């Protein structure tokens, strides 16, 4: 009997100790994780993103984050070889221009499961805010913020020239006249030249009720080459009149610090609304946000994902990467640091929480997006595979026109032929 009791007691002890051991293991500290996070931007973005990372590490001591950042051009040059080697960072800042290129090549993780299991909380985010990161119903990029195309103007130079902008109903002809008046009366460029063309030519098409790419990405959508001719003839007139910079001058701009409006050489810069804050911080002159020409009738403006976060399939820490994205998007303390610089927050809860604490320039962005949002249309799908080649082709074509090496008429036909060949080959 004693022997049986001893055996039973031994078994009980084994279970008790094993239970304690399992409990200790379960309650022990989490496994240390190192995440690589990459983004592009200027120095102000680098500074506050670093602070957000430090805040995340403080709240999650088991996570160490290695930051990798560069300007726009260098960022994509670095990302390409990393992608080829299967060594992409765990979280990569993504642009819609490259989303299809990486997503359709099976290099990005579908984030839908992380939104469904609550790892990324979408309870205060409108579904339309996320659509810009979807391809074939897979969420390859999570939108960090939204912005709207805008005209950013130096109020001192407008006043000096004795001109104003009637944003509700000004036309392309009004814009051209304004540029001439600014050059003549204020002695500065009337515009930064609407550079780069892959952003502003598609907007021009939208004001005419047309689109740049077909829905399926297999070719150009607009059929009338006269639209191309009209757009670039205006650009050429402005350069000839010295009211817009030459391509050589535009090529010297490597960051916001170099922009003509910051240097006081231009009264107007065309850009996305989230860029306003950076410009406002870099110049002493008062800047204002205006709706671009002819946006009203065709509802030419759209809410565009300013940028997205993606997780590559090669990441070994996808769950932790998704947790960081959730923090970046939904944490109010983090967004007090971000302050909408990456676009107006997609979370209504976060947007409402930070708005009372925004300064004048930051408030201007939110109010501009709210104004523009009253008259917008559905955003275009993410740029198709091959769009990077098309973008380069359009830029090269634009340069040739502005250098007067080719006529807009001839360039329109050549561009159409080559662009369609690229898109047909890739889609």
From Swiss-Prot:
Top-level taxon: Bacteria
Induction: Up-regulated by growth on type I rhamnogalacturonan.
Alphabetical list of SUPFAM superfamilies matching this protein: Periplasmic binding protein-like II
Stored InterPro entries: Bact_solute-bd_prot1, SBP
Reported function: May play a role in the degradation of type I rhamnogalacturonan derived from plant cell walls.
Assigned protein family: Belongs to the bacterial solute-binding protein 1 family.
Protein name as annotated: Putative ABC transporter substrate-binding protein YesO
Species: Bacillus subtilis (strain 168)
């Amino acid at each position: 009997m004693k022997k049986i009791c001893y055996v039973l007691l031994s078994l009980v002890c084994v279970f008790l100790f094993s239970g304690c051991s399992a409990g200790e293991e379960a309650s022990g500290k989490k496994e240390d994780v190192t995440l690589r996070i990459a983004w592009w931007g200027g120095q102000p973005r680098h500074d506050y993103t670093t602070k957000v990372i430090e805040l995340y590490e403080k709240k999650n001591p088991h996570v160490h984050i290695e930051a990798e950042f560069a300007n726009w051009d260098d960022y994509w040059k670095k990302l390409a070889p990393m992608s080829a080697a299967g060594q992409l960072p765990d979280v990569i800042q993504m642009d819609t221009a490259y989303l299809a290129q990486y997503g359709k090549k099976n290099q990005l993780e579908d984030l839908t499961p992380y939104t469904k299991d609550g790892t990324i909380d979408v309870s205060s985010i409108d579904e339309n805010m996320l659509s810009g990161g979807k391809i074939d119903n897979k969420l390859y990029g999570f939108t960090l913020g939204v912005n709207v195309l805008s005209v950013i103007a130096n109020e001192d130079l407008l006043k000096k020239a004795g001109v104003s902008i009637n944003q509700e109903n000004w036309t392309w002809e009004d814009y051209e006249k304004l540029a001439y008046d600014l050059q003549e009366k204020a002695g500065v460029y009337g515009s930064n030249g609407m550079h780069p063309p892959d952003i502003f030519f598609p907007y021009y098409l939208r004001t005419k009720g047309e689109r740049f790419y077909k829905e399926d990405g297999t070719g150009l959508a607009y059929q009338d080459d006269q639209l191309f001719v009209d757009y670039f003839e205006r650009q050429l007139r402005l350069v000839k009149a010295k009211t817009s910079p030459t391509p050589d001058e535009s090529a010297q701009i490597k960051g916001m610090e170099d922009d003509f409006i910051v240097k006081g050489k231009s009264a107007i810069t065309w850009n996305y609304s989230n860029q306003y804050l950076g410009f406002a911080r870099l110049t002493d002159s008062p800047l204002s946000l205006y709706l671009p020409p002819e946006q009203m009738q065709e509802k030419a403006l759209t809410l565009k994902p300013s940028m997205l976060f993606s997780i590559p399939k090669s990441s070994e820490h996808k769950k932790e990467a998704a947790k960081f994205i959730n923090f970046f998007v939904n944490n109010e303390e983090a967004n007090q640091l971000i302050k909408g610089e990456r676009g107006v927050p997609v979370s209504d809860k976060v947007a409402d929480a930070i708005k009372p604490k925004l300064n004048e320039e930051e408030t201007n962005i939110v109010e501009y997006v709210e104004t523009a949002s009253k008259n917008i249309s559905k955003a275009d799908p993410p740029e198709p595979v091959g769009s990077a080649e098309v973008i380069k082709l359009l830029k090269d074509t634009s340069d040739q026109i502005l250098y007067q090496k080719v006529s807009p008429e001839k360039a329109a036909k050549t561009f159409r032929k080559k662009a369609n060949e690229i898109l047909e080959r890739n889609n």
